[in-house]
Amino acid sequence: MAEVRVGENESLDNALRRFRRQCSKAGVLSEVRKREHYESPSVKRKKKSEAARKRKYKYNK
């Protein structure tokens, strides 16, 4: 989890901006969205193979 300590002369807006940047770098929001709904292993494999097929098609085009 991202953690930000607010300095003595630092505004709350700057600290909030740093916190949001750290969260985005750590991938917190994307992880939350990914885990929002359960996805069975078979569905994960299907999505992964479909993405690979799309990449391959795009590359050969």
From Swiss-Prot:
Keywords: Ribonucleoprotein, Ribosomal protein
Gene Ontology BP terms: translation
Key word Transcription present: no
Basic residues composition bias: residue spans: 43-61
A GO term for molecular function: structural constituent of ribosome
Disordered: annotated segments: 34-61
Any single Gene Ontology cellular-component annotation: ribosome
Family, as annotated: Belongs to the bacterial ribosomal protein bS21 family.
UniProt-recorded name of the protein: Small ribosomal subunit protein bS21
Organism: Thermoanaerobacter pseudethanolicus (strain ATCC 33223 / 39E)
Encoding gene, per UniProt annotation: rpsU
